[in-house]
Amino acid sequence: QDSYQLKYDENGALARNGQIIPELLARMLQDPYFSLAAPKSTGKEIYHLAWVQQHLQALNLAHAVAGDVLRSLVELTAITVSDAIKTVINPALVEAIYACGGGAYNQFLLERIAENSQIKVRTTQELGIDVDQMEAIAFAWFAKRRVEKLPANYETVTGASQKCILGALYAGK
């Protein structure tokens, strides 16, 4: 964003034209988070510009070509997402996985996930579900299950020891 004065890399075009910086990718892949068992979740609270700059500085790459850094970050994301997928899915038994959210707009990222996971990657748009609405739909389903007093978790996904009813209902004023 900073180097190109853009909000995002549309379809991963800038990253697609970059080259992986092997030592940067190897160093980032050593982050302890990636070896934690699922379930897990993270985001900008850990992985932000300062995190990338710290790795670049440690490798004396503070002046690396921005497109090469982007390419390395796309590969980092594709590898770690693919590794996580493979812990819960046998690629030989799955026809496709479906992406939603902001990453679903990055065609290059989806291609790299498909290559690394050996599973076709499509977007939820192909299922008639807007990629920007999937999270809202999921939370609506959680709420429906709560109202119906039915469990809404899967032990193999959440790591819970048993199925349980999620959330709470409170009386309004």
Stretches with model-predicted labels:
Residues 1, 79-164:
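Catalytic phosphate/nucleotide-handling subdomain of diverse soluble enzymes
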Residues 1-78, 162-173:
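Conserved ATP-utilizing enzyme core subdomain
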